[in-house]
């Protein structure tokens, strides 16, 4: 790495910055996962408490309208809406996410409220599991970053194998034709 920067200091500075970035990213990821989980729990409370706004047709509450405002302040809100929609679709819940009054609303049939609540419960649990898997992957990346000698060793073995191949070492071990009995 010294050749990239002229001396070892530049390489060490880059490594330091990458470690800081990985740590900051891991902290931001954990914070966002925690916030998402808490907000999903809050939305579940709204569903379970019957506080979703009912929309009546012919005097009968047919649809419920649930504010997604709690989720809107999270990073990658558009992705979160897609995740919610995908989870509801997988549960065969007919729904729509509609914009309105400065916030998005989840529109679903009142009779599907238990399935909607269950979908949000599953998302709440899956958020923690996904955060754990992401932390593991970040740790793996950090380990690979801290162990460049393993990569250098593999590169050296590949160079040796390439040299051996180009020098013809082992070329006489190719497939041979075996003659069968004469007829």
What are these model-predicted stretches?
Residues 1-91, 98-183:
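Positively charged, small/polar-rich N-terminal and surface patches that mediate targeting and assembly
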């Amino acid at each position: 790495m010294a050749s990239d920067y002229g001396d070892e200091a530049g390489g060490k500075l880059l490594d330091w910055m990458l470690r800081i970035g990985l740590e900051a990213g891991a902290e931001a990821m954990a914070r966002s996962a925690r916030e998402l989980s808490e907000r999903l729990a809050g939305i579940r409370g709204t569903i379970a408490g019957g506080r979703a706004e009912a929309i009546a047709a012919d005097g009968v509450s047919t649809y419920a309208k649930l504010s997604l405002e709690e989720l809107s302040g999270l990073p990658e809100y558009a992705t979160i809406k897609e995740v919610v929609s995908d989870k509801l679709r997988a549960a065969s819940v007919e729904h729509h996410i509609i914009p309105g009054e400065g916030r998005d609303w989840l529109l679903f049939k009142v009779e599907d409220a238990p399935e909607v609540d269950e979908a949000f419960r599953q998302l709440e649990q899956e958020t923690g599991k996904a955060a754990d898997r992401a932390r593991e992957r970040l740790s793996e990346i950090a380990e690979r970053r801290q162990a460049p000698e393993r990569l250098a060793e593999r590169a050296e073995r590949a160079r040796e194998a390439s040299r051996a191949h180009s020098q013809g070492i082992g070329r006489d071990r190719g497939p041979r034709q075996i003659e069968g009995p004469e007829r």
